[in-house]
Amino acid sequence: MTLRDLLADSPDNSLSGIKWHTLKQSIVKCLLSIGDATILELSTELQSSIPTISKAINELLADELIVDSGKISNSGGRRPSLYSVASDKTFFLGVEANRSGTSFGIQNLKEEFISIDLDSSFILENTYESLMEFCDRIDTFISDSQVDKSYIVGVCVNLSGRINSKEGFSYNYFFKENRPLVEIISEKIGLPVYLENDTRAMTFGEYAQGVVEGEQNIIFLNYSWGVGIGIITDGKLYYGKSGYSGEFGHSPLFDNEILCHCGKIGCLETEASGWALVEQFKQALQNGRTSAISIDNDTSAIEQYHKILSGVLVKEDNLCIELITRQSEMLGRALASLINILNPELLVIGGDFSRLGDFVLLPIQSSLKKYSLGLVNRDVAMKKSILGRRAGVMGACRVIKEKLLTPLT
């Protein structure tokens, strides 16, 4: 038996079989949550007798799903054993697909990467053929990682746009009203699959392993091709009713008659985003501005976008800096409204633009000071993401673990 088998439904459909299976699931979930525990601690936590817990522990040991981690050193008398989930047989796979490429990462229980690939150029398109290739690439990554597939307890796929994580639907990719996307992918790769919004996963990654240092109320800004936010309140990801929270880029802030990708006019993204930057750069050149950066109209908009960003870092091009400064000031003003409403402890700036450092951070900070309430502004610290492109796959792996810890009903 693998951990994935244990976390699935009981093979014994009798009442006693289901009850016993559920107890062993609860023990494993408890150990995943707290790290390690004695039989007495598990008995207290799960409100089950010591003999019953001992019997279940012995079965889990026999199945090599948990291990004896050693004795408690500071206990008087007979020292009890500590038990933990077998770390060499428990892995989480995070996958992030966006307009720039696809990233893969497998983490162990210690949240260490066993294998990671952030450089796949595969672009997921909204076609069935592309989805099947996407699934094949997941399988190839697992095979190349040399991690036994049976030890991967779950896969979390991050996609942009509106994601219903509870039901497994993406409303931007492969939306089939009667078939959740997670079912299609799971059927193809043979693993449990979860779906998450890319910005929310990045937020969780930063919270778990990034710049967050104990703060419990956080706004994460994903400033990339599009613009979104992730929100953590009291240490928990905020989803909203159906999981669509964080569509910050579609705030209707401008009377500019520019059509957004969402179908509305005047969204924040129409003035401050990667795709807006490309349009603004082209328009500036048409208006007679000069730049050290030249973009080939035969290349994709995504390639043009990354070239403009590189123009700031590599050549410190005046036009690129001017456009990004203007965008960042607009974002700062929009963020000031959020800060006034939510009163967070920490604002994390992430996404592609964050690698530009002070070229983005200083204009945002200036606008925050100018437009947010002084008392509220003094409460919030602003930091740049330290995880970069790893944030998404880190968060995806963490999402799987959190899903496994969902209380049994």
Model regions and ranges:
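Short glycine-rich anion-binding loops that position phosphate/pyrophosphate groups of nucleotides
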Residues: 160-163, 224-226, 353
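Glycine/GP-enriched mid-protein hinge/lid loop-to-helix segment characteristic of carbohydrate kinases
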Residues: 3-7, 12, 116-118, 126-130, ...
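Short glycine-aspartate micro-motif
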Residues: 92-96, 152-156, 218-222, 228-230
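ATP-binding/phosphotransfer module of carbohydrate and carboxylate kinases, centering on a glycine-rich
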Residues: 1-69, 75-78, 82-118, 123-148, ...
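Hydrophobic "anchor" residues
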Residues: 113, 163, 170, 237-238
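Glycine-rich phosphate-binding loop and adjoining helix at the ATP-binding site
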Residues: 120-217, 359-369
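Short, ordered coil/turn segments that flank beta-strands lining enzyme active or ligand-binding pockets
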Residues: 88, 109-110, 166, 233-234, ...
